[in-house]
Amino acid sequence: MIEFENYTGSESLHIAGFQVFKDEEIKESISLFSTDLKWVSRLSHHNDIFRTKLGDIKQIQNLDFGVLNRLLAKLIDAEEFEVLNNQYFCKPPNYKMTSAHQDNAYFDSDDNVFTFWIPLQDVDLLNSCMFYVPGSHVVGLLPHKIIGTNVRTRTGKTGFSLYSDWYNNSEFVKVPMKKGEILVHDKNTMHFSSPNLSDDYRIAITCIMKVTKWKY
């Protein structure tokens, strides 16, 4: 079994390609999302809900996080930005890992795109935390393979996930987090999340943002 090193937080987003932030104002805002999955579900259209093969809600796309998006933009010094997608992820108990990939493999953009990943509970190796290859964002977009894993509710259409085996597992570091912390990564940073081996759902929200104007 591989022993992954822990993220130390000593390197910046620019150097490592990812960074964990703590912000009390954002912590209050995201607490609104941590109470009731059904409440969040009502904010979405049925076509935006993906389910696992067992029928569990896996993710909900195209949510409106409003104020939260503006608060997150401040963390990376974005003066103007465009929200590409907001998602709500609900990883069921005893559910598989999310394979290693770069977010940019999904949209292949030359723009400055960042993903904010915000757990709604403490996360660690047991209940599925994130893993990154530090500095991998500077390499650019790498080859990926398509894996069909998601089923969109009502339409029955299968979505797809992408996988890359470019890096060895030993090159990843694990990033355990506390509820209220915010993780941001570059569009080209290689990452995956471990299986949820706990008996509870692991819930997180993501905000994918394109910076159109920096403060500096």
Enumerate the predicted regions with their spans.
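Extracellular structured ligand-interaction cores
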Residues: 18, 111-117, 127, 172-174, ...
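Non-heme Fe(II)-dependent double-stranded beta-helix
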Residues: 1-102, 106-109
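Coil-to-beta-strand transition motifs
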Residues: 95, 111-113, 182
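Double-stranded beta-helix
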Residues: 125-190, 214
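Residues immediately flanking
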Residues: 23, 102, 120, 186-187
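Short, conserved beta-strand element in jelly-roll/cupin
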Residues: 108-125, 208-212
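Non-heme Fe(II)/2-oxoglutarate
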Residues: 1-8, 34-44, 67, 145-147, ...
